[in-house]
Regions:
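N-terminal glycine-rich anion-binding loops that anchor highly charged ligand groups
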Residues: 10-23, 35-47
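Glycine-centered short loops/turns at secondary-structure junctions
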Residues: 29, 76-77, 149
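Glycine/small-residue-rich loop that forms an oxyanion/phosphate-binding "nest" at active or ligand-binding sites
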Residues: 54, 62-111
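Conserved phosphate/ATP/ADP-binding segment of small-molecule kinases
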Residues: 92-167
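Short pre-catalytic strand/loop immediately N-terminal to key active-site residues, enriched for Gly-Thr
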Residues: 138, 142, 170-181
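Short, well-structured alpha-helical segments that form the helix of a local strand-helix-strand
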Residues: 140-145, 200-215, 233
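Charged C-terminal helix
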Residues: 213-253
């Protein structure tokens, strides 16, 4: 469905992720736009099909854009995704995370440490890398989902998705994926593209399975992180609905 509609997705993301994220989204069939200026972020959010917000390289001007864009998306009934990168690492990040959380994201996607920190518990986050297991974040994910009325995806070696009542685990993926910067950030863009006009829970599960399956495909050919990136873009481009139906490893308890 996503390829047929090629949704326009606005991404207020970090400097590290922009290029990788745009290429990942284009390979998948979405239409990414990296629009973050305060003067236009809210106006653009009103016309985009979905919005993603990533707090990786924060600054006050960007924070203002994130809030106005999220409010505009809410006002227009457009879904938006929060990627709370290293949200527990500094006081500033915790403050910004709390402000964005209060705007009730449609989907929150983060690693276990980020989800635990966002829910308000001490987490063993080392910046952007997860020190906590996905299973440890399960309770925090449920609490966050019930607080926002949205979906929470805890991503790691296996992914957990919940909307507070429904649960799914996605087991697709490849060990090289964490070795390449911005692949997690780029996944947030794919989630944004998948949820445009769809049930957020099922669309998020599908997005994670698709992304992980592309990683598995890439891993079959790659000799290391460099060749993996190239093979991953190709896999995102070539995977179709039938491949996803056959290859998705989704557990619903």
């Amino acid at each position: 469905h996503m390829r047929a509609t090629a949704p326009l997705v606005q991404n207020i993301t970090n400097f590290v992720a922009m290029n990788v994220m745009a290429n990942v989204m284009l390979a998948a069939g979405a239409s990414p736009a990296m629009v973050h200026a305060q003067e236009e972020a809210a106006e653009f959010a009103a016309i985009a099909s979905a919005l993603t917000v990533n707090i990786g390289t924060l600054s006050p001007a960007w924070t203002a854009s994130m809030q106005t864009a999220a409010k505009a998306a809410n006002d227009r009934g457009k879904p938006w995704v929060l990627d709370p990168v290293a949200v527990g690492a500094t006081t500033y990040r915790r403050e910004v995370g709390a402000k964005l959380l209060a705007l009730n994201p449609t989907v929150i996607r983060g690693n276990a440490s980020e989800i635990i920190a966002l829910a308000g518990e001490g987490a063993s986050g080392k910046g952007v890398d997860a020190g906590d297991a996905v299973s440890q974040a399960s309770d925090a994910a449920v609490r966050l989902a019930r607080r926002t009325g949205g979906v929470v995806a805890v991503t790691g070696a296996a992914d957990l998705v919940t909307d507070g009542t429904r649960f799914a685990e996605v087991e697709n993926g490849h060990p090289l994926m964490p070795r390449i910067t911005a692949l997690g950030c780029s996944l947030t863009g794919i989630v944004g593209a998948f949820i445009a006009g769809q049930d957020p829970f099922e669309a998020t599960v599908a997005a994670l399975a698709y992304y992980g399956l592309a990683g598995e495909r890439a891993g079959e050919k790659a000799k290391g992180p460099g060749s993996f990136q190239v093979a991953f873009l190709d896999a995102l481009y070539t995977l179709d609905g039938q491949d996803l139906a056959r290859g998705a490893r989704i557990i619903r308890p």
